[in-house]
Amino acid sequence: MSELELAFQHVAGASAPEAERVQAWLEPVFEAHGRGGELTVRIVDEDESRALNRDYRGRDKPTNVLSFPCELPPGLPAEAAQILGDLVVCAPVVAREAAEQGKPEADHWAHMLVHGALHLLGYDHEDPAQAERMEAEERRILAALGVPDPYQER
């Protein structure tokens, strides 16, 4: 497995964790699945999040995290397969959700990044069985990071 190469784009004015912390939260996700490669994490405001969510998911509202797996056309060299995709995180939404849920903002950032990374690896939560599998993996990785179960009632 190769290392995780993170491109960090902080384009929103809102506060966000440092790139090193973001990488520390993401590396265990890809290590656990024997994957490495290039990943872009873009921190955005609500306007950009809303536009992307509307254009790609048909939902005209900002959201906490969007995952864009890299879909390469056939015939590209093997090195190209090392591009994992992009995560777009809306800093104001993550901050608001953390406050509403009564949890430390850093814990919610870790959860949203792990959640988004799992989507890049093919996890989903469209039906109860998928959601259970994905949430179990989130809990396992977050526990290893010292982050409490995000699904436990507070």
From Swiss-Prot:
Disulphide-bonded residues: none
PROSITE patterns (UniProt xref): UPF0054 (PS01306)
Names of the cofactor(s): Zn(2+)
Keywords: Cytoplasm, Endonuclease, Hydrolase, Metal-binding, Nuclease, Ribosome biogenesis, rRNA processing, Zinc
Organism domain of life: Bacteria
Gene Ontology biological-process entries: rRNA processing
Gene3D superfamilies according to UniProt: Metalloproteases ('zincins'), catalytic domain
A GO term, aspect molecular function: metalloendopeptidase activity
Assigned EC number: 3.1.-.-
Enzyme class: hydrolase
The keyword ATP-binding belongs to this UniProt entry's keyword annotation: no
Subcellular location as annotated: Cytoplasm
Pfam families: YbeY
Comment on bound cofactor: Binds 1 zinc ion.
Positions of Zn(2+) binding: 115, 119, 125
Any one of the GO CC terms: cytoplasm
Described purpose of this protein according to its UniProt entry: Single strand-specific metallo-endoribonuclease involved in late-stage 70S ribosome quality control and in maturation of the 3' terminus of the 16S rRNA.
Family under the similarity heading: Belongs to the endoribonuclease YbeY family.
Protein name: Endoribonuclease YbeY
Gene for this chain: ybeY
